Amino acid sequence: MTNPRVFFEVAIGGKTIGKIYFELFADKVPKTAENFRALCTGEKGNTQAGIPLHFKGSSFHRVIKDFMVQGGDFTAGNGTGGESIYGEKFPDEAFPYPHDQPFLLSMANAGPNTNGSQFFITTTETPHLDNKHVVFGKLLSGKGIVRQIERTETGEQDRPKQPVTIVDCGELPADFQVPVGNVDDGTGDDYEDFLKDNDNVDVNDPASVLGAIEKLKSIGTKLFKEGNAEGALKKYLKATTYLEDYLPDDLSEENIAKVHALRISCYLNVALMALKVNQPKVAIKAATSALDDETVANKEKAKALFRRGSGYAALKNETDALKDLNAALELEPADGAIKNKIEEVKQAAQRRREAEKKKYAGFFGGK
């Protein structure tokens, strides 16, 4: 038999980020797979309380990095509800697969034989869940989407601070071609959004990892030279994500130096591109990351201070802007761009003071 395939279209904070595609193991756990499939299509109508038996519009209510993302509670939305197509709960069907890899679909439960509609997607190996939770499917495509969910900021009870919503879902036609891996977007970037999810990068080989990061950086530079600052920013950010995920403890001194150099360079490039596309907060964060690297040289430090100061200036925070810009000028006293920026910020601060003076003078001017 051919196993059914389904999809989720996901939004974070109201912005659609893409689709996740799944294969359901109907050949091994047909009852569990059918429950999930029907909840994707919504074909079974409503619960007794009149709530649609449908994942559409429901959320991922629990997210734990390096563990799993959980959803499927379309009745309460907080992990206390949900219902299967067979009634409120149904028994554990079988345990044919271990939780031995990321991107498996497994049933959430409150103990033995309490399956409803809640599910989770693993983001790493979770062997402690074996023979307790029914694995009934796997992800076919959309690793980057799951990783974005996994990395969304959470608050109490591991609940995402921004809603992570299944805005659409359904079953795929038999002839639908699911995109495999990360499809080249036309720039030469055929890498997944997160380092450890790549089949074409050996995370145990520094040359393979650093080669991928260098390629992403060069793609970003090419896009920048072509006038595509927004596209360049995406590639530089992707390179920094790879660098943040790459923390082996057995690197040679030569490779450690390469990692530091790449990290500083990529953060500086992110800061520059972010300023060009009017994302000053991104620029400030990236420049700060460059400054935090203990190997940053004075020339790069001056660039980072200049770009962070420019970010503060864009946010009309002239105090912090001048602090950074003056520090940059101390390192590069002959740099005309820094001098010009300092003068520009001083003038902006003066105009602000004069405007405020004029505004408040009216409160005490008589009539």
UniProtKB/Swiss-Prot annotation:
Its EC number is 5.2.1.8. InterPro entries: Cyclophilin-like_dom_sf, Cyclophilin-type_PPIase_CS, Cyclophilin-type_PPIase_dom, TPR-like_helical_dom_sf, TPR_rpt. One of its GO terms (molecular function) is cyclosporin A binding. Residues 7-171 form the PPIase cyclophilin-type domain. SUPFAM superfamilies: Cyclophilin-like, TPR-like. Coiled coil: none annotated. Its main location: cytoplasm. It catalyses: [protein]-peptidylproline (omega=180) = [protein]-peptidylproline (omega=0). GO terms for biological process: protein folding; protein refolding. It is found in: Cytoplasm. Keywords: Cytoplasm, Isomerase, Repeat, Rotamase, TPR repeat. TPR repeats lie at residues 213-246, 264-297, 302-335. SMART domains: TPR. GO terms for cellular component: cytoplasm; intracellular membrane-bounded organelle. PPIases accelerate the folding of proteins. It catalyzes the cis-trans isomerization of proline imidic peptide bonds in oligopeptides. Belongs to the cyclophilin-type PPIase family. PPIase D subfamily. This is Peptidyl-prolyl cis-trans isomerase D. The gene is CPR6.
